Amino acid sequence: EMKALSSLQSIDGVYSVFGNHDLGFYMKLQSDDTFTPAASVVQLIQQQQQMGWQLLNNTSIAIHRGQDSIVVSGVNYPRDGFHNGRETGLGGCDLDTTYHNVSDSAFNITISHTPQNWDEIRNAGKADLTLSGHVHAMQMKLHFGKKVWSPARWMYPRWSGLYSEGNQYLYINDGMGYVMYPMRIGTYPEITLITLRAAS
């Protein structure tokens, strides 16, 4: 996967955040049990640096285009420092640190691996658009005309596509790949292209 991802390029940079698969919990432990979440993260940071990516770990960066600018923020995973009841030792989502130097007037895009953070992100009042993934619609979408059902509805109040509250938006990408069972039913791999236009 890293070889394919390394071809991604952008004139304004490629930005990333940590997700649950980056912590190494789904890999078989080495015989000496040294492949810890911290070791997995160090390895991933090195790989991303070699690819020219910028990891946003409770940090924000301004992108300027002429007289205009937007701020891209990225928050850490997991939200509370625990994954499935296990402490990662890598901290968690810290919105105060993330938005420390972000002006209220700036247009902000926040990247949060999990959409479960959105209520806190929205209440912080900085993010105009939040981009998330994680859910994969639980790898199952049943389509009935224009209606779609997924078991993700039982666990997540927001699980796929576009949501809005006032002037704040959340988009959840269905991603690609799988966990546990090697299939995706009606949940097609997704790459999302979002065009930003200035208000008229």
Per-segment meaning from a language model:
Residues 53-54, 60-74, 103-104, 164-169, ...:
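Beta-strand-turn-beta hairpins that frame and shape the catalytic cleft
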Residues 65, 70-112:
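Catalytic-adjacent loop/helix segments of enzymes that bind and process anionic phosphate/sulfate esters
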Residues 24-39, 80-90, 144-155, 179-186:
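Acidic/histidine-rich helix-loop elements
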Residues 20-22, 59-60, 75-78, 114, ...:
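Active-site metal-binding loops of divalent metal-dependent hydrolases
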Residues 5-11, 102-104, 123-125:
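Short, conserved loop/helix-junction motifs that constitute active-site signature segments
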Residues 1-64:
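Core catalytic region of metal-dependent phosphoesterases/phosphodiesterases
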Residues 15-16, 109, 115-192:
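Conserved beta-sheet core of the metallophosphoesterase superfamily
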Residues 194-200:
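Short beta-strand-to-coil "C-cap" segments at the C-terminal boundary of structured domains/repeats
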